[in-house]
Amino acid sequence: MNIKAIIETAVYVDDLRATETFYRTFLGLPVIGKEPGRHVFFQVGEASVLLAFLAEATLKGDLLPPHGASGPGHFALGIEAEALDGWRKLLQGHGVTVEKEVEWPRGGKSLYFRDPTGNSVELVTPGVWGLPSGW
């Protein structure tokens, strides 16, 4: 009996429209679910979902238990190594500041930037953590 994967990751945002524009239009993630005033969900790869919730909308329980966070969160999206330069140029071309670029001791590289709410988004190439990429 083993856990196989992380299926979904939640981030908490303050503007769903700006969040949808950023992730759908800019990063190219397809929208797979949306409830105005509550959330927008994006497909990431073949088997993962990024859940973007309005923070205050998740504090009251309904179908799901209450959840949420305050302050910026962090998550990483996997990219191919040869796409790193293209992503850097795309980010900079859209006025998105690359906060940090890291070459990891075990292998792989990361670019860090912020979404419209201030969440830390990382684009990471295979080799980080010494694990196979899986993408």
Task: Enumerate the language-model features and the residues they cover.
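Short, conserved charged micro-motifs
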Residues: 18, 82-87
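A short, sequence-level motif marking secondary-structure junctions
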Residues: 54-59, 127-129
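Short beta-strand/turn micro-motifs at beta-sheet edges
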Residues: 61-65
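N-terminal beta-strand motif that seeds the catalytic metal site of vicinal oxygen chelate
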Residues: 1-17, 72-77, 127-135
